[in-house]
Amino acid sequence: MPASQRRAERKREILDATRALFDERGVRDAQIEDVARAVGINRAIIYRHFSGKEELFAMTLVDYLAELDEALSAADEPTSPPARRLEAITEAFLDFGSGHPAFVDCAQALLRRRGDELFEEVSESVMLKLGVGMTSCLSHVVRVLEAGAQTGEFHVPDPYLLANIFYTQGLGVLNLATLQLSVRGENSPTRGARGETPTGLPSVDAVPFEQVKAYMQRGAVAMARGDVD
């Protein structure tokens, strides 16, 4: 077997092991040592293929994005009205994130880094793959926004910007749904008058995922229509 093929196979083994650990334990609890142990190699070998933990995370996210791309493609029906298409894509994104909590953690872990900081820790080739994966997913939303603009239903000056907003907003909502923790003031001894914030200790409550999806779908369509001046 050529050395290049062996290297590619080993790299694939490392990524598969990382993905399995992410899905099993979550991103926070996955360590380089655990990945090396799962593959049956020394951790030093991992650093021959990846510059560090951030680059390994980025390449694992590329795998998640490829699957998300397929899910968004399957959900979109080009013959449907733009608003319905946007609702379907929003639902598909949220369902994917709900089924893959580690995807949300991995994406948010990288989003916490400034672009210039990430470039210092991740090679240009990996950043390119990550960018292609992100763009492929965002393009589903962009095409729907552009279709809605052509019919006059949507008013979006910068479709890619709004698609990026949807992406980061969706990750935040998925984190809320995963934590199942929303803060309420319903246990306050007295409620404030004239719409004032009630006093008392906050309480916590569950987050109904179907209701979250409905809010996100309506919100996405409203933003695309320009109903949020």
Predicted regions, residues:
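Short secondary-structure transition hinges
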Residues: 95-143, 160-161
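C-terminal peripheral helix-coil segments that are non-catalytic and often amphipathic
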Residues: 95, 135-151, 164, 168-229
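Hydrophobic alpha-helical connector segments
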Residues: 59, 73-103, 163-166
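Helix-turn-helix
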Residues: 9, 13, 21-55, 59
